[in-house]
Amino acid sequence: MRITFVTSNEHKAREAAGILAGLAEIEHIPLEIPELRYESVAEIAAGKAAYAYSVLQRPVITDDTGLFVHALNGFPGTCAAYVQKTIGNNGILTLMAGYANRSATFETGIAYHDGNCQKSFTGAIKGTIVLPRGCSGFGYDPVFEVDGKTLAEMTGEEKNRISHRAIGLHALRRWLAEEKQ
């Protein structure tokens, strides 16, 4: 089975290819998708998948990720990509100055669409916002700590076992194995 992962982020496509290996061949296309605004990452991913399928007319996967910082009432939430581009990790750390509660949740919505069926999956991990550590990964990985290590300090294999995206992609994998084989 061949599925197109529509994302501008090559790291995400590689992560998906690794998790879905042996079940689906992942093709990466960085199709420009209009920015969607919904309350949940699953809704945004589903909207992106519907759009991507309408353009490409082949099975697609899309995703959307949110970072929900508890001390900041869930900010940046579903606007995580925009916030990363504009104020970055240093901006988040500045906003959190003076807050003792450093807890946060990373959540990813993964959506599959093949023209006949659309299905969404979510994955979430809880962690802590810390000063940047590590040099692998991307985005918020250097400041998001889980069990004493930031996502940027983990190997790709370690991250693929526990990340929010990996959890959603593993749910997609189980569903594809049951429904599409």
What residue ranges belong to the model's regions?
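Anionic-ligand binding patches
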Residues: 1-4, 11-181
